[in-house]
């Protein structure tokens, strides 16, 4: 896989596919980025290219605008933050239309000098970006490719998507992987190939079905698999426990029984949970044993004893991978489990990886220092699919 060091970019236009898909607070007059982690992660690649005299054209998606312009998903607010982090102006090439690489964008890009940068409008304003029709996708890839002479893939969070800007454009231009993609791959290889032991994995989130592939891939490799979040209730049901009104995938119970039989004592489930009479921050709550959830009550977090149990299992780990919150951390009464696990991972002396998505958001929301972890991934789904051993379209396109 080529790197940006292999490209002679001085004086040339370089299309960089970054991942600037950040959350925006739109409650005020001006949209405000609430978590700029992905913007910051994109800077090393862009800065390196600019320092070498490239004329950089940054592209990204934001949210799911359904293939047509939607002002609330505009990347314009991100251009300002990117300029602050780069320490130089960023020309925004959007004009409010879905013509992402049209006349206005071409004019902005043509006006770039060496060491200057522009940001295209949200790629997903164009139906061709995510189209299942290869011809439609190819036509949009042709438009994007016409803007540049080189392509750099640096959107690790999107490499599992067969989208035009991720998988089709690199077939049309000399290409390389960006700094972020290379860093993410190095980290994931450490997790999947001969990790230092003991190796503990913490999985949370809502559904077993969403994590089944990674569970099956990692279970033979780990010393402990700690299961929290909504998915733990299907495992508890597989043990014969009632789970009240908690999230339950009945179709996955038999699968969980098989996993429990395979994993034995290496699969660690909560011993207590925080339950509520309804899904609300002001609900009545209680801490109950994991096998004594009252009928109609919802399990919304792991309990304090479970948090201590998980922390103890993490304390001596040489390698830790954490993906998925332990509860509904966005609501204060159900955040303690996620905070406790995050703090335990952060306090460990081994190699610790936070697996993107909601886990990364939880770290920042709860105010835990990011530098306490060895790595916070920008790719939730991409990280999991890599660990499952799947072929990721965006990586396959760069590796030729």
Curated annotation (Swiss-Prot):
Q: Which UniProt keywords apply?
A: ATP-binding, Cytoplasm, Glycolysis, Kinase, Nucleotide-binding, Transferase
Q: Name one Pfam family in it.
A: PGK
* E.C. designation(s): 2.7.2.3
Query: Can you state which reaction this protein catalyses?
Result: (2R)-3-phosphoglycerate + ATP = (2R)-3-phospho-glyceroyl phosphate + ADP
Q: ATP-binding: is it a keyword of this entry?
A: yes
GO-annotated biological processes: gluconeogenesis; glycolytic process
InterPro entries, alphabetically? Phosphoglycerate_kinase, Phosphoglycerate_kinase_CS, Phosphoglycerate_kinase_N, Phosphoglycerate_kinase_sf
Q: Which residues cross the membrane?
A: none
Q: Where does substrate bind?
A: 19-21, 38, 61-64, 124, 161
The Gene Ontology CC terms held by the record are: cytosol
Q: What class of enzyme is it?
A: transferase
Q: In which pathway does it act?
A: Carbohydrate degradation; glycolysis; pyruvate from D-glyceraldehyde 3-phosphate: step 2/5
What's the family? Belongs to the phosphoglycerate kinase family.
Tell me what this protein is called: Phosphoglycerate kinase
* Naturally occurring in which organism (per UniProt): Frankia casuarinae (strain DSM 45818 / CECT 9043 / HFP020203 / CcI3)
């Amino acid at each position: 896989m080529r790197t940006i060091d292999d490209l002679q970019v001085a004086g040339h236009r370089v299309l960089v596919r970054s991942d600037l898909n950040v959350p925006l607070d739109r409650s005020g007059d001006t949209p405000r980025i609430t978590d700029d982690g992905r913007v910051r992660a994109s800077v090393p690649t862009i800065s390196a290219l600019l320092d070498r005299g490239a004329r950089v054209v940054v592209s990204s998606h934001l949210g799911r605008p359904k293939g047509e312009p939607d002002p609330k998903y505009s990347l314009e607010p991100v251009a300002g933050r990117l300029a602050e982090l780069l320490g130089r102006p960023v020309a925004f090439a959007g004009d409010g239309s879905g013509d992402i690489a049209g006349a206005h964008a071409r004019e902005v890009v043509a006006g770039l000098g060496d060491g200057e940068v522009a940001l295209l409008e949200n790629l997903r304003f164009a139906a061709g970006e995510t189209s299942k029709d290869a011809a439609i996708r190819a036509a949009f890839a042709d438009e994007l490719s016409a803007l540049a002479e080189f392509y750099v893939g640096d959107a690790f969070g999107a490499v599992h998507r067969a989208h035009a800007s991720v998988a089709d454009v690199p077939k049309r231009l000399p290409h390389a992987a960006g700094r972020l993609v290379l860093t993410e791959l190095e980290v994931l290889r450490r997790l999947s190939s001969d990790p230092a032991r003991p190796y503990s994995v913490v999985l949370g989130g809502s559904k077993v079905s969403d994590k089944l592939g990674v569970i099956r891939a990692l279970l033979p490799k780990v010393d402990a698999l700690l299961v929290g979040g909504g998915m733990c209730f299907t495992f508890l049901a597989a043990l014969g426990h009632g789970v009240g009104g908690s999230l339950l995938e009945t179709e996955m119970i038999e699968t969980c029984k098989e996993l429990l039989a395979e994993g034995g004592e290496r699969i660690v489930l909560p011993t207590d949970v925080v339950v509520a009479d309804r899904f609300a921050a002001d609900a009545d709550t209680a801490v109950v044993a994991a096998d004594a959830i009252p009928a109609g009550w919802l399990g919304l977090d792991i309990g304090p004893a479970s948090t201590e149990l998980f922390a103890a299992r993490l304390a001596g780990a040489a390698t830790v991978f954490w993906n998925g919150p332990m509860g509904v951390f966005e609501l204060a009464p159900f955040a303690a489990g996620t905070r406790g696990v995050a703090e335990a991972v952060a306090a460990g002396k081994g190699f610790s990886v936070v697996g993107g998505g909601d886990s990364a958001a939880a770290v920042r929301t709860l105010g835990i220092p990011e530098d306490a972890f060895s790595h916070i991934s920008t790719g939730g789904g991409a990280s999991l699919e890599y660990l499952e051993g799947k072929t990721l379209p965006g990586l396959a396109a760069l590796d030729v």
